[in-house]
């Protein structure tokens, strides 16, 4: 099939007059229920004239996009019934929430899920009343909506979620409505390229439906105003075959849309049939639909002398004063009665039988499709024993390794054992992040042209790489929401590109947890590497650890942040995260050569606790003895610098009782009243004391540690070092010095904070200042760090040899 192939308006119609009449009535029923949800408190079937008490005092909702969504839904039901198709519906214009609720109700799913809202007049009254009403449901296609995997509040992610749902679902078709406003967003523009990653043999299909109703909130849309030939050329350039449906006469549009959907589904079947018949898999040209209908179609044409239907004025509530303005109320009643509710519902308020017969049944209903409640389909990963990948550690700090390279061997075998339910996403960084061992079990999925020098590209790869963090996260979210597992690996600084996507996913999870009918899904797992302390070669643009702060702002029951200090702890944490459900897990780990501290048994015990005293690095060892100072650390580089500082202190001040505490699970720092992983006060005080100085070396921005610990008894004695936005292209040790996180500055902090040391150890303090100057001078002269610093390792000493 040629990329130049184009189809415009389909000829003919597969609908008989009877079928057309029924589909039109079904559409009218959905529109009626949609308007009722926006406006009505009572009198759902208009058994009496509308009065002020029948109308909501606050009108909230969006009408403009809703009739278009309802139109597509009605016609997809016909496709599902006629072809026994497995279809879910993703609505980019999620503000058309009343439409999706209406259709779930018409199919009977809503009453099955929410048993108090029956299919009768009283059920209709409750359905209408709850919409955008205190104690009710939100205005968008949120998690409360049966059949939804995409809320559509923040625009841009519909298409990428749809493709994520289709991956590894060979018999699923994801119909995805894209609003012409949403089409102006960056993620959506990139999302068109997802077809280059869709394997027609092993994946399902996505049917994009570009809804051109012409307007956003208050402005025209770009794609609706360019010449149609230019629009078609754009879509063909993306690799699609557009089929256009256009008009404002319902009868004509029904006939066009029925023909267009038949043509599109025939095209999908032909593509998949050819690909699955054997032979080389090539990238096909998938069909899509361009749907041009008026915004606010079937609503008021004119309100207060101004055009509404077909304009931006129909975006939200076309009649805004129906509670207090009799003219608006009369116009609302006329609007509602125009749908002929007596033709759609019987006297008891039930959808008439001939219309109910238009909806699919059971799991084929889009509102009841198990793919849209992915936890129903979720199977545990078949995970290898992570202990088999352990880094041998005979004594702490004596072995050098690359933590993410170690993890890559584990992930290789995770992929090998779960080829139908696990994918790894990365924005062209998987090899850079030293995870390339995975290519021993899989390739990178790629259906476009290849060149002889390309490596690891294949149509059926498990790794997905595209230089768009939005696509990586969106694909993974769609994959998870439909019952699968995955991992998103990313440079730490650039994961900020998807900050708002994380926000939206967290909101979805929070709501889903409150809905007993929504089953738990696999956690959204981030692996952040190439992190702030080892981006000395790329400079300030690549140095930002603030994603942790964003995650920490989210609801405690959803978020977990892990900072494993070495490869064995990283393996333990990764295994835990891949087994978890309904969380957002953030793992921050280094990729550069670094010291390994814990053997596997010790790593498992340490990660299980989440934090703990490293006895082998401490000099405060006597039973019952209080330390003079606590050196705490979280993150691989802060751990290195803390241990180096402890090494200096034990040599220079052998009588100083130092306790080293390492933190893997950052949320352990909070009280147990604030986070499920939080430490009770008595346990926190036992580790960090109630009155001794705590010098805390932290991977990210220092203020987060203060936020997490501000209720602790010893907070006034807590002094945190971390990233202070001092960065450039320099050496690794110069980076930590720029931010006062280096070993010499940590020693200075101890001398300044422990009572009596300032004067007694004045010479040591001066030597630390001199050591910092010397280290910086060395970099300026040689262009690298002093080998004595760069090659430092932990050596046993008499005072802590018992545990070594």
Swiss-Prot record:
Cofactor(s) needed: thiamine diphosphate
MF annotations from Gene Ontology: aldehyde-lyase activity; magnesium ion binding
| EC number(s) stated in the UniProt entry for this protein | 4.1.2.-
Its family remark reads: Belongs to the XFP family.
Keyword terms: Lyase, Thiamine pyrophosphate
Taken from the record, one Pfam family name reads XFP_N
Which Gene Ontology biological process is one annotated for this entry? carbohydrate metabolic process
Source organism (scientific name)? Mycolicibacterium paratuberculosis (strain ATCC BAA-968 / K-10)
Judged by the first EC level, this protein's enzyme class is: lyase
Its recorded name reads Probable phosphoketolase
Do you know which InterPro entries this protein is assigned to? Phosphoketolase, THDP-binding, Transketo_C/PFOR_II, Xul5P/Fru6P_PKetolase, Xul5P/Fru6P_PKetolase_C, Xul5P/Fru6P_PKetolase_CS, Xul5P/Fru6P_PKetolase_N, Xul5P/Fru6P_PKetolase_ThDP_BS
What superkingdom heads the lineage?
Answer: Bacteria
PROSITE patterns (alphabetical): PHOSPHOKETOLASE_1, PHOSPHOKETOLASE_2
Q: Does the keyword Lyase apply?
A: yes
Q: What is the lineage of its organism?
A: Bacteria, Bacillati, Actinomycetota, Actinomycetes, Mycobacteriales
Question: What CDD domains does its record include?
Answer: TPP_PK
Has keyword Ribosomal protein? no
Coiled coil residues, start to end: none
């Amino acid at each position: 099939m040629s990329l130049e192939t184009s189809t415009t308006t389909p000829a003919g119609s597969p609908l008989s007059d009877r079928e057309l009449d029924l589909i039109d009535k079904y559409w009218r029923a959905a529109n009626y229920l949609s308007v009722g949800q926006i406006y009505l408190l009572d009198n759902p079937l208009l058994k009496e004239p509308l009065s002020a008490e029948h109308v909501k005092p606050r009108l909230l909702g969006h009408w403009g996009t809703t009739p278009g969504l309802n139109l597509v839904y009605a016609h997809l039901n016909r496709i599902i019934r006629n072809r026994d198709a497995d279809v879910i519906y993703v609505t980019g214009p999620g503000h058309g929430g009343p439409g999706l609720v209406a259709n779930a109700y018409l199919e009977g799913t809503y009453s099955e899920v929410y048993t108090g809202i029956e299919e009768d007049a009283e059920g209709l009254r409750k359905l209408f009343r709850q919409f955008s009403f205190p104690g009710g449901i939100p205005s968008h296609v949120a998690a409360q909506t049966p059949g939804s995997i995409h809320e559509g509040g923040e625009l841009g992610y519909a298409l990428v979620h749809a493709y994520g749902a289709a991956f590894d679902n060979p018999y699923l078709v994801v119909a995805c409505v894209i609003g012409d406003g949403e089409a102006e967003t960056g993620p959506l523009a990139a999302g068109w390229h997802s077809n280059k990653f869709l394997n027609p043999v092993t994946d399902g299909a996505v049917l994009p439906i570009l809804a051109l109703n012409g307007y956003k909130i208050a402005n025209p849309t770009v794609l609706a105003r360019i010449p149609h030939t230019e629009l078609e050329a754009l879509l063909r350039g993306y690799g699609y075959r557009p089929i256009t449906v256009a008009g404002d006469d319902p009868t004509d549009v029904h006939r066009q849309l029925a023909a267009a959907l038949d043509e599109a589904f025939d095209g999908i079947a032909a593509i998949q049939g050819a690909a699955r018949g054997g032979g080389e898999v090539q990238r096909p040209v998938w069909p899509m639909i361009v749907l041009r209908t008026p915004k606010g179609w079937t609503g008021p044409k004119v309100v207060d002398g101004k055009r509404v239907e077909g304009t931006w004025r129909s975006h939200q509530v076309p009649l805004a004063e129906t509670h207090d303005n009799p003219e608006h109320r009369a116009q609302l009643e006329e609007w509602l009665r125009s749908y002929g509710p007596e033709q759609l519902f019987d006297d008891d308020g039930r959808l008439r039988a001939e219309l109910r017969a238009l909806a699919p049944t059971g799991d084929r209903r889009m509102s009841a499709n198990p793919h849209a409640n992915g936890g129903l389909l979720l199977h545990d990963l078949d995970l290898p024993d992570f202990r088999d990948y352990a880094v041998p550690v005979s004594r702490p700090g004596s072995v050098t390794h690359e933590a993410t390279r170690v993890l890559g061997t584990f992930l290789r075998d995770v992929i090998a054992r779960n080829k139908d339910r696990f994918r790894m996403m990365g924005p062209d960084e998987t090899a850079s992040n030293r995870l390339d061992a995975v290519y021993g079990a899989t390739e990178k999925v790629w259906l476009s042209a290849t060149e002889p020098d390309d490596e690891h590209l294949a149509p059926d790869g498990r790794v997905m790489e595209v230089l768009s963090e939005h696509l990586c996260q969106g694909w993974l979210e769609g994959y998870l929401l439909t019952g699968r597992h995955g991992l998103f690996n990313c440079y730490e600084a650039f994961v900020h590109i998807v900050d708002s996507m994380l926000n939206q996913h967290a909101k979805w999870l929070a709501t889903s947890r409150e809905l007993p009918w929504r089953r738990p899904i696999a956690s959204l797992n981030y692996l952040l590497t190439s992190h702030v302390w080892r981006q000395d070669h790329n400079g300030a643009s690549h140095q930002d650890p603030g994603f942790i702060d964003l995650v920490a702002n989210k609801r405690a029951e959803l978020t977990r942040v892990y900072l494993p200090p070495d490869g064995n702890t990283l393996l333990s944490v990764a295994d835990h995260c891949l087994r978890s459900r309904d969380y957002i897990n953030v793992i921050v780990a280094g990729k550069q050569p670094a010291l390994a501290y814990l053997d596997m048994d010790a790593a498992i015990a340490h990660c299980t606790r989440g934090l703990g005293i490293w006895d082998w690095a401490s000099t405060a060892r006597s039973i019952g003895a209080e330390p003079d100072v606590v050196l705490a650390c979280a993150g691989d580089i802060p751990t290195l610098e803390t241990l180096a500082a402890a090494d200096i202190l034990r040599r220079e001040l052998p009588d100083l009782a130092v306790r080293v505490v390492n933190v893997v699970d950052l949320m352990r720092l909070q009280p147990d009243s604030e986070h499920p992983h939080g430490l009770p006060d008595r346990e926190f005080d036992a580790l960090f004391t109630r009155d001794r100085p705590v010098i805390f070396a932290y991977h990210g921005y220092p203020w987060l540690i203060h936020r997490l610990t501000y209720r602790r008894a010893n907070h006034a004695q807590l002094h945190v070092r971390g990233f202070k936005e001092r960065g450039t292209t320099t050496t690794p040790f110069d980076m930590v010095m720029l931010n006062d996180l280096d070993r010499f500055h940590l020693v200075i902090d101890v001398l300044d904070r422990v009572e009596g040391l300032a004067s007694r150890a004045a010479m040591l303090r001066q030597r630390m200042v001199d050591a910092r100057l010397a280290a910086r001078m060395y970099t300026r002269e040689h262009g690298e760090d002093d080998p004595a610093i760069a090659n430092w390792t932990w050596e046993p000493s008499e005072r802590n040899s018992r545990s070594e």
